[in-house]
Design a protein with these regions (language model features):
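Phosphate-group recognition and catalysis centered on beta-loop-alpha active-site segments
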Residues: 1-148
Length: 148
């Protein structure tokens, strides 16, 4: 038996990290699973993005936990990587979990923010259970308090 191959933020060397395109490409390239980062928006949507700040990936200043989902969805999360990815949108956790159905494993890193630690843990667990991925999912966080 060989070790599992996990694509960090999807096939992020070829596509914009933490996007549906990157996750689908990881499958095409033969990955067994992928790692993604989950944050919660001001209006309590679960979105997949590593950085809190949108500046680097979109060219628009913003802090994901302080933004509403509809505003985030208007931003382009792809063109920073290459013009061919222009128009790539920030995915919701639910969209990413749908893609994860085709993989053996999904590694979800929780990005806690201020008073939302407990909420993000509970909401991510519920989403994983709703998607039927409890046997494939691993949850991690750099914030120990979020995992208690």
């Amino acid at each position: 038996m060989r070790p599992l191959i996990i694509a960090h933020r999807g096939a992020s060397h070829l596509a914009p990290e933490n996007t549906l395109t990157a996750f689908r490409l990881a499958k095409t390239l033969g990955a067994d699973g992928f790692e993604c980062d989950v944050q919660i928006t001001r209006d309590r949507h679960l979105v997949v993005a590593h950085d809190y700040l949108t500046d680097l990936k979109t060219g628009v200043h913003g802090n994901i936990p302080d933004m509403d989902f509809d505003d985030l969805r208007q931003l382009d999360f792809g063109k920073w990587k290459s013009p061919e990815f222009a128009g790539e949108k920030i995915p919701t956790l639910e969209e990413v979990l749908e893609v994860a159905q085709d993989f053996r494993m999904i590694h979800i890193e929780l990005k806690p923010y201020l008073d939302r630690d407990e909420e993000i843990v509970d909401r991510v667990i519920d989403a994983v259970l709703d998607a039927g991925l409890e046997e494939k999912a691993v949850l991690t966080s750099f914030e120990y308090g979020a995992l208690r």
